[in-house]
């Protein structure tokens, strides 16, 4: 079962702030989290049942540091449509 610790952060970009006006929140999670698990976590910890959830798998970027090549972790990005009047205030993990 997924836990709130699988949620890495809420993403704040120009696109996500524009979607916020339409009632969406963009959440970055670990790669293993599913839509149903995210729905359960949001319901348990924030008391919000999402109307709609869309997900994307994002590949981690390749980075170089002092000549050594490494890779950031892959992650999932969820676009969560919240009911009218509902919000997720903070995500202090």
From Swiss-Prot:
One Gene Ontology term from the biological process aspect of the record: translation
Keyword Nucleotide-binding among UniProt keywords: no
GO molecular function per UniProt: rRNA binding; structural constituent of ribosome
Gene3D superfamilies found in the cross-reference section: 3.30.70.330
One GO cellular component term: ribonucleoprotein complex
Classification via InterPro entries: Nucleotide-bd_a/b_plait_sf, Ribosomal_uL23-like, Ribosomal_uL23/eL15/eS24_sf
Keywords, in A-Z order: Ribonucleoprotein, Ribosomal protein, RNA-binding, rRNA-binding
Function: One of the early assembly proteins it binds 23S rRNA. One of the proteins that surrounds the polypeptide exit tunnel on the outside of the ribosome. Forms the main docking site for trigger factor binding to the ribosome.
NCBIfam families for this protein: PRK05738.2-2 (NF004362)
Record note on quaternary structure: Part of the 50S ribosomal subunit. Contacts protein L29, and trigger factor when it is bound to the ribosome.
Family: Belongs to the universal ribosomal protein uL23 family.
Protein name: Large ribosomal subunit protein uL23
């Amino acid at each position: 079962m997924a836990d709130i610790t699988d949620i890495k952060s809420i993403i704040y970009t120009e696109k996500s702030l524009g979607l916020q006006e339409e009632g969406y929140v963009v959440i970055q999670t670990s790669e293993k989290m599913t839509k149903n698990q995210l729905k359960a976590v949001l319901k348990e910890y924030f008391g919000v049942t999402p109307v709609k959830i869309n997900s994307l798998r994002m590949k981690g970027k390749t980075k170089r540091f002092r000549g050594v090549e490494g890779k950031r972790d892959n992650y999932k990005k969820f676009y969560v449509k919240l009911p009218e009047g509902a919000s997720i205030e903070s995500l202090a993990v």
